[in-house]
From Swiss-Prot:
GO terms for biological process: cellular response to heat; protein quality control for misfolded or incompletely synthesized proteins. Residues 625-805 form the Lon proteolytic domain. Belongs to the peptidase S16 family. ATP binds at G388, P389, P390, G391, T392, G393, K394, T395. This is Lon protease. It is found in: Cytoplasm. The lineage of its organism: Archaea, Methanobacteriati, Methanobacteriota, Methanomada group, Methanobacteria. It comes from Methanosphaera stadtmanae (strain ATCC 43021 / DSM 3091 / JCM 11832 / MCB-3). Transmembrane segments: none annotated. Homohexamer. Organized in a ring with a central cavity. Induction: By heat shock. InterPro entries: AAA+_ATPase, ATPase_AAA_core, Lon_bac, Lon_bac/euk-typ, Lon_lid, Lon_proteolytic, Lon_Prtase, Lon_prtase_N. The gene is lon.
Amino acid sequence: MTQEMENENLSFTQQLRKDGFIKDIDTNPTCFDDTDSQNQLPIIFIPNTILLPHTDITLNLDKQHTDNLLHTVDDNNHGIILTPKKLEEGNGNVEFYDVGVILEIKSLTEDKENELLPEEYVLELKVKDKVYVNKILKKDGFFHAQYKILPEENTLTEDEITELNKNIDETVLEIAKFLPNTDKYTRKILGKLDTQDKLAEVFPFLKVPINKKQELLELDSVKIRALKVIQLLLEQKDAIGIQMELAKKLNKKMNETHKNTLLREQMKLIQEELNMTDDTPAHKTYRERIKDAQLPKEVEEAALEEVTKLERQGQNNAEENIIRNYLDTILQLPWHKEENPTIDIVKAKKQLNDDHYGLKKVKTRIIQHLTVLKMKKDKQGSILLFVGPPGTGKTSLGKSIAAALERPYVRVSLGGVNDESEIRGHRRTYLGALPGRIINGMKKAGKTNPVFVLDEIDKMTESLNGNPTSALLEVLDPEQNDSFSDNYLEVPYDLSDVFFIGTANSLQDIPGPLRDRLEIIELDSYTNTEKHHIADEHLIKEVLLEHGLTEDDLKITYDAIDCLIEKYTRESGVRGLKREIAAIARYVTEKIVVDNVERPYVVDENMLYDILGHEKSHYDKVPDSNPPGVVTGLAWTPIGGDILFIEAVLLPGEEKLKLTGQLGDVMKESAQIAQSLIKSRLATVLKDSDIEKRDIHIHVPAGSIPKDGPSAGVTLLTTIASLVTNTPVDSTLAMTGEISLRGKVLPVGGIKEKVIAAHRSGIKTVLLPEENMKDLDDVPCEVKDDMTFKPMKTVDEVLYEALGLKLPENKPLNISIDEINKVTP
């Protein structure tokens, strides 16, 4: 709108000169000719201007152009305004719109207000009718237009006029709020009562291209034109509003910046008045800090070199911040070796026992490691790696060791790390470079001898950005980590005093070179008895504290804890058990706050369904009896042991073996070995049977769960033997062990977990490989005392104990080489 106002105040000469059309007024457009016709009027050219009928306009012209204009109009002071559409490049031809308006000169006065300017005249003009130009003619050296009047359709009712005028006025007032110095024009628009007059006043202020204004002029209906103008005004109002809002925000931001600058200048003046000004340049401050830090020589030289670079940087230079961050990192790191406190073995034992129940072998190994440290008094030696299922206390053991040694505790999770730079850091040439997690951990510790737990090191993966496990080799190797090189620091850092502890769920995902540098300590699954003690001594107390309760508010009975362990959790650790206890605590908290129940609130086994819902886990129980072809085996899983039923049936066929239940290759091979042993060892027993005309189908239930491993060998053998001899096996008997083709029973792993699972499921007798009998030392006494264990060396012993079969001695054929050669052709 403001630009249109400025254009309105331009003289006609200035307007023509500004838009480059003065020289084109005397040009012969291609459509001109010298034919005379009636209804002709001279043409007045006003570039970049579209006017509506009923428009009043004032022009300031110098004397020459005033004379030209007066010669152009007819005797009635009428002329036709046409607006050039485009200028064809190269030939100077001008193309005009076909529709224009008739202009009438109302008055002409000389402008005498400014005597310093050249002589000018003020012309008052009135736009009359809209016309269609048929031809453009040249007559007496001037251009004329042959035209016809285009009547406008004005069928507006009084109500429509009132409504349209109201909408125009309201929109104009809204726009005027955003723009300064528009009161004069706003009052002029509001003062018009006729819709066409109002449109004529608003039209010059529309911020739309010339061709769009021409389209509005060419509309026949005044009503449609008014509606379109209102729509354009509303769009213009929204656009101006957005611009003003952005300008307001920008202005506010600039004001805040100016305010902050002003306050800083004022502070500087105040400090100068109080002699508080610190004119010490940054590089001098850093030099003093580096000197006071007494860094190692190599590190000090590197830091001073960076300070020298800082001196050359200009103020607010991007490189300056990079150097400052580097120097701050150097100065925040601990460089001087701490004197390690004397290791109190008695205190360490007490700390471990207070924080963790059970884990006897693990605690013994940790204490042995600490005693070596106490005697050696220099490097820590081997790096400990705790391996075990989730929730068995691997990470918390590291925290207990830190407390026992009175050292800082730092934990870094490496799960999901697939970039070597996460360990070694990024080079400072990269934008946003940072040191690696090891150096950041040391900065956090503040000392050179923390207990540093590297959590989930088996969860690291290799990617295009390198292999982080390879970077850990230098960190965890006692022969190398006294000069660990971080890409960000670019100076060696001594990690030899750090007590590194790693944790992992599985050894399979740890590369051999890294595993070779670690002292592996395996943590087994907790037994139900151990879980019960942990819940009593640790979990319930922690949950009560977390929920703002005390032992006087909530009691959980012994049977309820057992039920939680057996029927609501199925895990190797105790995290799930703690979640269930927390759910009980939330329930009781609500009862106390809302219902004001009597305290202590006692939760027994019968209340668990109302609090926790249906049982969430189920353990298989042995049946009263097994049919022939069904035998109970023992299995190891990441969450502990379990019993495993193996089933077999005979089918008509050709002595083929069919296996189902998602069995792995090793387990399939064990079944084939079992079948071969049955054929060789039971040949005498089966000589009268039709076993050779039968297929054997073996299935292991829980078909959705993959199963593999050699420990089901004896169970598969016994299952087939039970089937073909039609002899059932005692349902309270279970077994585990690998078999060889020679009929040997070989040792397997996971004996502790398997035996505990057997006891939980009601098994009374377990057949074990003879070499695994020593592993029963790890089984809790309360479990061993309820069961009978029988050592097995051969499959013959297994079949005798399970089925009562006495097989003949397995003797090799006594045939000499000479006898074989005699019958060989």
